[in-house]
């Protein structure tokens, strides 16, 4: 997976196309990511021991990884990622600007 937790990504497809946010969680088995402020759903929460009140809450739902691209602040757009070996370590690099992500 070319997207990691904490990355800033831009949504390239779907109802939230064009929105930016940071990755909160990555689900490699299902190829999905949870992005802050993107794909917000309304959930009806039952009262429980943890949440006495219950009610309607808004929360982010995971979106497929093919619908996001890592954001490059150098170009201000979503970019493809390639890997390079620097000092024996594999690092992610923007394919356009060549800067490390």
From Swiss-Prot:
Q: Which CDD domains match?
A: KOW_RPL26
One biological process term in Gene Ontology: translation
Which SMART domains is this protein grouped with?
KOW (SM00739)
Keyword Ribonucleoprotein assigned: yes
Q: Which InterPro entries match?
A: KOW, Rib_uL2_dom2, Ribosomal_uL24, Ribosomal_uL24_CS, Ribosomal_uL24_KOW, Translation_prot_SH3-like_sf
Q: Which cysteines are joined by disulfide bonds?
A: none
Q: Which family does it belong to?
A: Belongs to the universal ribosomal protein uL24 family.
Q: Tell me, what does this protein do in biology?
A: One of two assembly initiator proteins, it binds directly to the 5'-end of the 23S rRNA, where it nucleates assembly of the 50S subunit.
Quaternary structure, from the entry: Part of the 50S ribosomal subunit.
Write down the HAMAP family for this protein, in alphabetical order: Ribosomal_uL24_B (MF_01326_B)
The protein here is known as Large ribosomal subunit protein uL24
Record the organism: Clostridioides difficile (strain 630)
What taxonomic classification does the UniProt entry list for its organism? Bacteria, Bacillati, Bacillota, Clostridia, Peptostreptococcales
